[in-house]
Amino acid sequence: MLLSYDFKIEFYNEKQSLEKDTSSGDSLIEETPKIIINTQYGIHVDISISNMFSNYNFVKSKQAKIVLWNLPLDFNDHIKVGDIVKIYYKKFAHEKKFDFIMAGYLGTPMSTDYPSGDFSVELDVRLAVSSNFFNRKLENKSFKGMTVEDAIKSVFPDRNTINMDEKDRLQIIDKNIYASTPKEFIDKIKGVYIHDVIADYGNNNSNVECIYIFTNDRTTEPDEKYKALEDYGLEFIPQQEITIEGEYSIRRIYWNAQIFYTHKIKIGDKVSFIDGLGKMIKTTIKETSARLSNTGDCSLILKLKDDSN
């Protein structure tokens, strides 16, 4: 069965509400999209998704660049900075259901006319990493005596994915960690109880634009715990990259891989592949990015941390 990617892009107005309605940091949007772009009707769309640091430079999140080709010249009159954009995809022509990729806030649209007569609109969509959410006042401000998992869940309710070994998740916080905001909480536990925190795609079934993935360097697990990248259309044998990190010059092994685009592979997942010598390499996904087009290739690009490190 041949892959035939199509995309649906929805544009929403952000709902005007009282400050108390958004004190949790969630954005409220109108129920019905004001514009829907569906590539099944002949529209050419190119999308790239990359990693960037948010206004809080300790949190890395996603940014999408969408290029729409040959739309009506007045298209930009119907969208505005701050609109909420949702992006969906499907892999096969016979499929009816579109799966969610990401949502975010629209930046300033850029239009370009080409000598060939083509016309493009370039849209910058940034994963919503809300200042309201990071600076909201916490009810529980002291975390000493709690497990790392319970502390994270109390600060990031319904927004957390904890990709850590059980030992690390259940570790008791024995330091005097006091934080009045989520921003302060991350400042104090990162590098002590967690290795990294990354904002990633949220769940389309709610108003939450992003979730926060908490990771530690995890140990190697049994083979059955790993997803084989070959099952997801591995495009080439991953390339090895060796870096020296930290003040103790720790040697780290990473791999760069590329598979057919899917929403079923996420940061923190355990994945494996067979190298050129026939050996199974076990890794953890460190970063993801994507190149998508309904007229070209659709790839998910992975940075993998070797679990043998």
Regions found by a protein language model. Name each.
Residues 1-124, 254:
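Assembly/oligomerization scaffold segments
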Residues 47-78, 215-309:
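An acidic/polar, Gly/Ser/Thr-rich interaction patch typically located in mid-to-C-terminal regions
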Residues 73-75, 112, 192-197, 291-293:
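Short beta-strands and strand-coil junctions in structured, solvent-facing domains, enriched
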Residues 76-88, 134-143, 266-274:
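Extended Gly/Ser/Thr-rich low-complexity repeat segments
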Residues 101, 113-132, 158-245:
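Short beta-strand-centered interaction patches in the first periplasmic/extracellular domains
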Residues 116-137, 297-309:
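Short solvent-exposed strand/turn elements
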Residues 145-162:
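Glycine-rich, acidic and aromatic/proline-enriched surface loops and short helix-turn segments
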Residues 149-153, 183-186, 252, 265:
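Extracytoplasmic/secreted envelope proteins and their assembly/folding machinery
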